[in-house]
């Protein structure tokens, strides 16, 4: 009975979330991309670029793997939990990259420079400009926010600020649409929450 109630609660969220994403794709994404292109400044590009570098998944993967492996002999919670952080970034990143190739959505620069906005699903584009949906950086950003704040509670405000900042930077730099960031964030958060549930606190 409890499982059925939980499942129904989850399903209730699907419709509004799906509606929000659809509305963004239809009416929000392109106008926001055009506005960002017209109003881009040196400051916004500098901040966005800094967050872009911070959101590269290899930083988190390298750090979490290093801590996990270094402390593995002790077999304590710190090692295991950092490897779960590694897994959350790796798994969510793989999911996002698979969807990118399948979806075939052109990035904002193609819309602005060439007027190309139509998706080409199952066209198997391998070019960067056709891998807009979802945002891989947003996926990593939310993994940093959820798992980073769980591992380092005192740094939770920093982790959430950094994670959300990384996601928003994709819109600021005009390399992703709003809906790309929304879906990427949801993938990252969902996988990270699942991994967070497997964390242990024993020493």
Predicted regions and their residues:
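Alpha-helical transmembrane segments of multipass membrane proteins
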Residues: 22-23, 67-69, 98, 147, ...
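Aromatic-anchored segments of alpha-helical transmembrane domains
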Residues: 20-27, 90-97, 163-175
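Membrane interface segments of multi-pass transport proteins and intramembrane proteases
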Residues: 37-49, 72, 154, 200-203
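Alpha-helical transmembrane segments in multi-pass membrane proteins
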Residues: 21, 84-88, 92, 96, ...
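Membrane-embedded catalytic cores of phosphoryl/pyrophosphoryl-handling enzymes
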Residues: 2-15, 117-203
């Amino acid at each position: 009975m409890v499982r059925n109630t939980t499942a129904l609660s989850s399903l209730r969220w699907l419709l509004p979330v799906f509606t929000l994403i659809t509305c963004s794709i239809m009416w929000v994404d392109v106008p926001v991309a055009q506005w960002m292109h017209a109003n881009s400044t040196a400051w916004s590009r500098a901040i966005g670029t800094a967050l872009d570098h911070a959101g590269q998944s290899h930083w988190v993967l390298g750090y979490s793997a290093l801590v996990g492996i270094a402390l593995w002999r002790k077999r304590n919670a710190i090692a295991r939990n950092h490897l779960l952080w590694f897994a959350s970034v790796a798994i969510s990143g793989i999911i996002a990259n698979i969807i990118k190739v399948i979806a075939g959505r052109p990035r904002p620069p193609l819309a602005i420079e060439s007027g190309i906005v139509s998706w080409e699903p199952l066209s198997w584009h391998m070019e960067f400009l056709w891998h807009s949906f979802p945002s891989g950086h947003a996926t990593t950003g939310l993994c940093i926010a959820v798992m980073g704040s769980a591992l380092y509670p005192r740094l939770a405000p920093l982790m959430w600020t950094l994670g959300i900042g990384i996601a928003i930077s994709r819109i600021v730099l005009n390399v992703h649409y709003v809906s790309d960031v929304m879906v990427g964030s949801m993938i990252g958060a969902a996988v990270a929450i699942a991994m967070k549930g497997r964390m242990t606190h024993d020493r």
